């Protein structure tokens, strides 16, 4: 497979591959309603392949061939320090987060599950279940506006909680 970053931003964006064969997308938020965009971001993706090969096919695309398995580690940093200060370094923040991944996938996943479940398991929501719940998720999403799917509403509620828990932990 091939991996590269794409973005809806039309300007202020640079895609590249580092010397360590990590994908990088850096940019700055667009101006909006006459206000200059000041938040800068850098996204890094480290690809670890088990078997096969990893090679750069362009200045912004990595290709994995004949691998038994592949793990993608994604790290995103911004220059946001607080609402009055955007003096941080997006690249060094993203690099710091990526360097902290020093476990294999199974250990990283287990640590993540342990960390979020102590908050996540405090709440449950049961809005009922009907035949919609037996359909594939992509079908349920497409049909949601025209069908009654209380279990999907509960699932979205829990998904939102999961994202909030994971994105609001100390240190990142």
Q: PLM features: residue spans?
A:
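Aromatic-residue-lined binding/catalytic grooves and analogous aromatic/hydrophobic interfacial grooves
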Residues: 1-172
């Amino acid at each position: 497979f091939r991996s590269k970053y794409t973005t809806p931003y039309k300007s202020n964006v640079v895609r590249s591959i580092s010397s360590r064969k990590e994908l990088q997308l850096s940019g700055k938020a667009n101006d909006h309603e006459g206000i200059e965009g000041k938040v800068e971001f850098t996204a890094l993706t480290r690809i670890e392949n088990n078997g096969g090969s990893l090679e750069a096919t362009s200045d912004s695309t990595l290709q994995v061939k004949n691998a038994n398995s592949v793990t993608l580690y994604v790290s995103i940093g911004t220059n946001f320090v607080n609402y009055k200060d955007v003096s941080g370094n997006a690249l060094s923040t993203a690099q710091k987060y990526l360097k902290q991944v020093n476990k294999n996938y199974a250990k990283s996943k287990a640590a993540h599950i342990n960390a979020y479940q102590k908050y996540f398991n405090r709440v449950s929501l049961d809005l009922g279940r009907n035949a919609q719940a037996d359909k594939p998720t992509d079908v349920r999403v497409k049909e949601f506006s025209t069908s009654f799917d209380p279990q999907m509403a509960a699932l979205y509620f829990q998904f939102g909680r999961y994202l909030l828990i994971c994105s609001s932990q100390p240190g990142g």
